[in-house]
Amino acid sequence: MNDVHPPDPDLALDIDGCCRLTGEFTLRSGQVASEYFDKYLFEADPTLLARVARVMVQLLPEDTDLVGGLELGGIPIATMVSSLTGRPAVFVRKKAKEYGTCKLAEGPDVSGRRVTLIEDVVTTGGAVRDATKALREAGAVVEVVVCAIDRSPEGENPLADVGLEVRPVLTKAELDGAR
């Protein structure tokens, strides 16, 4: 749970109603889940996207130089957060492109800058872990990830092993409680 509640008391209910799907879903981690939060449903809705981004702005560390949107789901959210804060965005690919600039991180140079990662859903943190490693190798200071939904087990930080603090807009428990 984060300490900015209730910035938008109906957000959990609205996100849950829009995005919760039931069935059998294989997650990036290989885990199988009976429920899935289709984050693209809220990311494609400009009103819901803006509401999520406004909460994220409150969760950003004050010393953030760049907001780093992870491909693909973190990019629309990071763009909105960038627009609301005036902080530049950097877009982090899953894999460096093999042509042109051959960059993994598109946008301003990250070297020596504090990058706060923006992600849609964190469960085990695999994509965030990969992006953190790549950005740190490029000279960025990465200490915080702000996510729309934290699906990790309550009370656990799946990214503690890489020294990242996870700051969620909503947790799975908050979404479950909204039903």
Language-model features, listed with the residues they occupy:
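Active-site-facing substrate-recognition patch
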Residues: 1-62
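PRPP-dependent phosphoribosyltransferase catalytic core
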Residues: 2-14, 133-179
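Short secondary-structure boundary/capping segments
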Residues: 17, 24-25, 106-108, 158
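Alpha-helical structural signal in soluble globular domains
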Residues: 59, 80-85, 134, 158-162
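Short helix-loop-beta connector
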Residues: 61-65, 110-112
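Short glycine-rich phosphate-binding loop at a beta-alpha junction
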Residues: 63-73, 146-147
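Short, glycine/charge-rich flexible loops or terminal/linker lids adjacent to PRPP-binding catalytic cores
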Residues: 77-116, 124-130
